[in-house]
Design a protein with these regions (language model features):
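Glycine-rich, often proline-containing surface loops adjacent to acidic residues and nearby aromatics
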Residues: 10-17, 82-98, 126-135, 204-219
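Long, compositionally biased interface segments
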Residues: 205-257
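Extended intrinsically disordered, low-complexity coil regions enriched in Ser, Thr, Gly, Ala
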Residues: 26-48, 102-124, 220-237, 242
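Hydrophobic alpha-helical segments and helix pairs
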Residues: 79-119
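Aromatic/basic-lined ligand-recognition segments
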Residues: 1-3, 70-75, 126-203, 213
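Short, highly charged C-terminal tails/helix-capping segments
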Residues: 124-135, 248-257
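N-terminal low-complexity, intrinsically disordered segments
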Residues: 1-86, 257
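Short, solvent-exposed segments of well-ordered alpha helices
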Residues: 3, 95-99, 225, 229
Length: 257
């Protein structure tokens, strides 16, 4: 079933992360001996749909000390999204305002297929983790509303401190910063799902930011053929949690009602 479309969606970024095993060297260093060739071959395969390559500053860090660090970006247009990023042991697919599930799913499946097609020695490509991450944010004036009151009223999350902690105290009731996180085991797909809420800023305005992350490692499907099933199952959970959390006033606000 396609995901609901929100006119004013709170999405900051949707990210797919694919990690693969690196070769250990002296000390704690890890390298992908095929990275340079992989990058060139991915360039050839991505250029049609992502014609704007962008070398990141960390590209100049030696590969021996830059494991799992993205170094090259491929954009659909200048300063535009979506994009794909590559580094030793890592590939990501990222989207922001233009995100739709159908498009993101298609791009993610295609990117994983291209990774396997481009990897110089595909038999040695050992995928170690798959991660689907959603970052959302909603503007909140925390000078007028306590963060746990907002969480309780708008997102159905009960978390608070007893009022008597602040009785006859010089400690202010409004927290300077708030961070809450929980991680749960997941059976389908096999892995864990985490939910994190923090106070921060979006576009210069005080906001509540939350991340919903489905991460699988170890027991992974056969790739690349099994990837579509994995991302569908991961999205089914993250999407279900998102809409259950915002049900009510926030969903109406994000829908533009």
């Amino acid at each position: 079933m396609p995901s609901k479309q929100l006119k004013n969606k709170p999405l900051v970024e949707a990210i797919l992360e694919v990690h693969w095993a690196l070769q250990k060297q002296a000390g704690d260093m890890q390298v992908d001996p095929h990275y340079k060739l992989l990058l060139g071959r991915m360039f050839d395969r991505l250029l049609g749909e992502y014609p704007v390559p962008e070398e990141l500053p960390q590209a100049f860090i030696p590969d021996q000390i830059s494991a799992y660090m993205v170094k090259q970006r491929f954009r659909v247009g200048a300063n535009d999204w979506p994009l794909i990023q590559i580094g030793p042991g890592i590939m990501t697919v990222n989207d922001t305002a233009k995100y739709t599930w159908t498009d993101f799913r298609s791009r993610s499946i295609a990117a994983v297929g291209k990774l396997f097609d481009a990897y110089p020695k595909v038999g040695s490509l050992n995928i170690t983790s798959l991660i689907l991450r959603y970052i959302d944010a909603v503007e909140v004036d925390f000078t007028k509303l306590r963060v746990w009151d907002f969480l309780q009223d708008k997102l159905k999350l009960s978390t608070s401190l007893p009022d008597n902690l602040f009785a006859d105290s010089t400690v202010q009731r409004m927290p300077r910063h708030f961070h809450w996180e929980a991680v749960f085991d997941c059976a389908k797909p096999s892995g864990v799902i985490s939910l994190r809420f923090v106070t921060g800023e979006k576009e210069g305005k005080r906001s509540l930011i939350w991340e919903t992350v489905l991460s699988s490692e170890g027991e992974l499907p056969s790739l690349p053929d099994g990837f579509a099933g994995w991302i569908d199952a991961a999205h089914a959970i993250t999407d279900d949690w998102f809409f259950k959390l915002i049900e009510g006033e926030l969903e109406r606000r994000f829908s533009g009602e």
